[in-house]
Each structure stands twice: as structure tokens, then as C-alpha cells.
Amino acid sequence: MMAARDFAALVAGGLIAAASVFPAYAQDAAAVAPAAPANALEVELNALAPSQKGCMMTFVALNKLAAPVNKISFELAFFNDKNAVDKITVLDFRDLPQGKKRVRQFDMPNVKCEAVTRILINDTPVCDGPAAGECMKGLVTRSQISVPFEG
């Protein structure tokens, strides 16, 4: 009986010790994880949906730069399943106020959503306003769907 009680106390003590170690490990891991840059222009590929014209593309942009962008356009390259560029086009994202999220949709004629395997922001031909020159430098891309989105 005494051995069972000692064993139970030992197990309980071990669980308490383990529980006190793991939160510290999680905090250390979080401290080491890379943070998103403070001065960033985040552009997310949010959705691709078939449309009557071709493919409706939805993007979410967040301007974390130190200033607003009065007008911006992105040159996008669309890749197919052979990793070949199918189309290059320029999309006008209009203005991106500082600290604000904006949703932009583009109906791409003669593009089949299912044929798009990757999208690349090749350039920012227009980046006007106080943040001019920072658009490509601060660009951070991500995709909410299975199609990779790179910058």
C-alpha cells in the first residue's frame, strides 16, 4: 500500500514538473519564430472562382508600410501545369491606405482557374504616393488556397 502511494506521489510530481516545463518551451519557441516585417505590403491570394468570362481572382492587401500608397499596380505571371508562363498581365489595385485592409477582385477573361498552378508578382509598374519605391521592397505574399502566390 505504501509503495502505491509513493508511486502516485511520484507520478503526480512528475506531471506537475512536466507541465511547468512545457509552457516555457512554447514561449521560447514563439520568441524564436520569425515575425512578419513591420514595414510590409502584404498581398494575399484569397480565392479563384470560375466566372462567365474566365476566372474571378480575389486578393486581400494590407499596407503596413510607413505611408499610404496612392496608386499601385502589380504585374502578375500565371503559370500552368507544365510550369510555363501562360499569361502576364498588369492589375490595378488602386490605392492602399496605410494600416487598412482592402479586397480587390479581378475577372480574368480567357483564364481557366483550374489551369493556374502558380502566380508570381513580377513587378510593381506603378507605385505612387509617399511610399513610392517601397512597394516591391516591402512585398510579402501568401496564399489562402492551394495555388502558390509568390512575390
Residue ranges of model-derived segments:
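Sec/Tat signal peptide C-region and signal peptidase I cleavage site
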Residues: 21-26
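Low-complexity, acidic Ser/Thr/Pro/Gly-rich terminal tails and inter-domain linkers that flank the onset
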Residues: 27-54, 58-60, 138-140, 144-150
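Bacterial N-terminal signal peptides that target proteins for export
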Residues: 1-11
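Short, solvent-exposed, Trp/other aromatic-anchored flexible loops in extracytoplasmic proteins
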Residues: 87-128
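The feature marks short-to-medium sequence segments in extracytoplasmic or secretory-pathway proteins
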Residues: 62-98
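Bacterial N-terminal signal peptides
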Residues: 10-20
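C-terminal structural segments of small proteins and small subunits
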Residues: 126-139
